[in-house]
């Protein structure tokens, strides 16, 4: 699922001096829930879905409880399977166009205040290095796509539901979870030409171990117990994100075209270089 195909957002590196071949494009893959945002993206929309008549009060309470458990202890494979069953059963018969409309209308009120400032900074740093940014989530594509666009991501990979006559059947076409995430990443890398050994990945959950293993540079964010143990054994960096902020309060990361233009102006280039250097030092990765 491509979020944007514009040249500025694709971040293709320029031709290197001397006419040599350009450096291969690389990517940074981000889990969404509890890595970029502080809650479950799907469960966060339970209130607007209720307000528009898609959920009853009992379903809202059940979703709130699931959110509490998710935040309290993270979600293991069994919990994720139960959550998947609950959510697919809940949305059977929903009108897809209505869901998309609700998400688009309420996105900035519901989700963008939950974005970790540290995650937004890290995404900006990767973009300044010329990398594509890919959001990878087990949540539905109707939710993940708009969030990814708001973050300035290049691609989004998410769970796809089966749709008939414009309504969800309650069955899943592709579950973007566990090994499914890793397979989706490998397929995108093959399509886009990403050398995965030079790519980055970030997640909070042990269930995303296959995704982290698929790249050359893995880091864990606010990890659950299982993933923290794996990170210790493998020597993966452990990042702590704790400051949710509104994207409306942040200045968007400059595009590649903007960077190239301002680079010709000494003072602008110096400022951009200082920002880039500070971000790279903060998150300890190579340009």
Curated annotation (Swiss-Prot):
Xref: PANTHER family: PHOSPHATASE RV3661-RELATED (PTHR43344:SF13), PHOSPHOSERINE PHOSPHATASE (PTHR43344)
Residues spanning the membrane: 258-280
Disordered: annotated span: 1-23
Binding locations of Mg(2+): 31, 33, 204
Keyword line: Cell membrane, Hydrolase, Magnesium, Membrane, Metal-binding, Transmembrane, Transmembrane helix
Entry's cofactor comment: Binds 1 Mg(2+) ion per subunit.
InterPro entries membership: HAD-like_SerB (IPR050582), HAD-like_sf (IPR036412), HAD_hydro_SerB1 (IPR006385), HAD_sf (IPR023214)
Cofactor(s) essential for the protein: Mg(2+)
Membrane topology summary: Single-pass membrane protein
Protein origin, superkingdom: Bacteria
MF GO annotations: hydrolase activity; metal ion binding
Enzyme Commission number(s) from the entry: 3.1.3.-
Gene Ontology CC entries for this record: cytosol; plasma membrane
Species of provenance: Mycobacterium tuberculosis (strain ATCC 25618 / H37Rv)
Cross-referenced SUPFAM superfamilies: HAD-like
Active-site feature positions: 31 (nucleophile), 33 (proton donor)
Recorded family membership: Belongs to the HAD-like hydrolase superfamily. SerB family.
Presence of keyword Oxidoreductase: no
Locations listed in the record: Cell membrane
NCBIfam families xref list: HAD-SF-IB (TIGR01488), HAD-SF-IB-hyp1 (TIGR01490)
Pfam families, alphabetized: HAD
The protein, known as: Probable phosphatase Rv3661
């Amino acid at each position: 699922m491509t979020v944007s195909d514009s040249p500025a957002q694709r971040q293709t590196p320029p031709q290197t001096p001397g006419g040599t071949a350009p450096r291969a494009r690389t990517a940074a893959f981000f889990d969404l829930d509890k890595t970029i945002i502080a809650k479950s993206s799907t469960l966060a929309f339970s209130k607007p879905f209720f307000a528009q008549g898609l959920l009853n009060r009992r379903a809202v309470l059940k979703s709130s409880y699931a959110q509490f458990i998710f935040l309290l202890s993270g979600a293991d494979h069994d919990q994720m399977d139960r959550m998947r069953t609950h959510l697919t059963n809940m949305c059977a018969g929903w009108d897809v166009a209505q869901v998309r409309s609700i998400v688009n209308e309420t996105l900035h009120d519901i989700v963008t205040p939950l974005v970790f400032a540290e995650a937004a900074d890290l995404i900006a740093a990767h973009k300044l290095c010329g990398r594509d940014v890919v959001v990878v989530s087990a949540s539905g594509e109707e939710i993940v796509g708009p969030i990814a666009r708001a973050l300035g991501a290049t691609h989004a990979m998410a769970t796809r539901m089966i749709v008939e006559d414009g309504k969800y059947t309650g069955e899943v076409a592709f579950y973007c979870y566990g090994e499914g995430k890793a397979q989706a990443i490998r397929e995108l890398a093959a399509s886009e030409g990403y050398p995965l050994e030079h790519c980055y990945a970030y997640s909070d959950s042990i269930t995303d171990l296959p995704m982290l293993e698929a790249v050359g540079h893995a880091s864990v964010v606010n990890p659950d117990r299982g993933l923290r143990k794996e990170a210790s054994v493998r020597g993966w960096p452990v990042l702590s994100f704790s400051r949710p902020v509104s994207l409306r309060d942040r200045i968007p990361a400059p595009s590649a075209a903007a960077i190239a233009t301002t680079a010709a102006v000494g003072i602008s280039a110096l400022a951009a270089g200082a920002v880039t250097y500070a971000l790279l030092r903060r998150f300890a990765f190579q340009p």
